[in-house]
């Protein structure tokens, strides 16, 4: 009688891998990933959040109205929202969000190294199930993963110390859940 497990589950869940291999993880994974600090002329001084609203599959998108509500809440707390993009459709979405989120910024299209620097210097990153959200977590940035069509147990932010997974298949998180998680992460980051 054999039991099989998908290898991807071990990659995304170091705790599970450790349990199967008979040892205990004493601390969150440290990836050794860093991003060179970078100053962005288009971004004023002060705290900012990166909102990674784009993803490779439309079914994984969080509703624009929810991003707007989140962005307005962050702006009211003095946190500027940055809305990066990679494709023309993502740029259009960033521009639509910009029209409703006070003090938000849509940067020029950024190379991966510049995106990494932007993420690393953020107060918090909130993103859909996308590679950049995982990069933020690996950089050690307080990160909220929003899941609308995938299972965070399989693809979530499991190996980062300051990552929170919200939502699930067919169950996108409410804005209030995301706002509460952002508040907790930012408060724990100040301690």
Feature locations, PLM:
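Catalytic machinery of carbohydrate-active enzymes
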Residues: 1-191
């Amino acid at each position: 009688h054999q039991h099989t497990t998908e290898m991807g589950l071990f990659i995304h869940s170091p705790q599970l891998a450790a349990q199967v291999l008979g040892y205990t993880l004493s601390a969150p994974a440290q990836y050794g990933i860093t991003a060179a600090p970078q100053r962005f002329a288009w971004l004023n001084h002060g705290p900012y959040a990166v909102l990674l609203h784009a993803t490779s599959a439309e079914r994984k998108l969080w509703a624009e109205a929810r991003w707007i509500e989140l962005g307005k809440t962050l702006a009211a707390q003095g946190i500027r929202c940055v809305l990066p993009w990679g494709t023309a459709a993502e740029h259009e979405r960033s521009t639509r969000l910009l029209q409703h989120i006070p003090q938000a910024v849509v940067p020029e299209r950024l190379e991966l190294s510049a995106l990494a620097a932007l993420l690393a210097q953020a107060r918090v990153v909130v993103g859909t199930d996308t590679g950049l959200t995982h990069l933020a977590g690996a950089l050690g940035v307080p990160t909220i993963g929003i899941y609308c069509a995938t299972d965070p147990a399989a693809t979530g932010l499991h190996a980062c110390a300051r990552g929170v997974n919200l939502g699930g298949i067919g169950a996108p998180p409410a804005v209030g859940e995301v706002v509460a998680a952002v508040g907790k992460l930012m408060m724990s980051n100040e301690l």
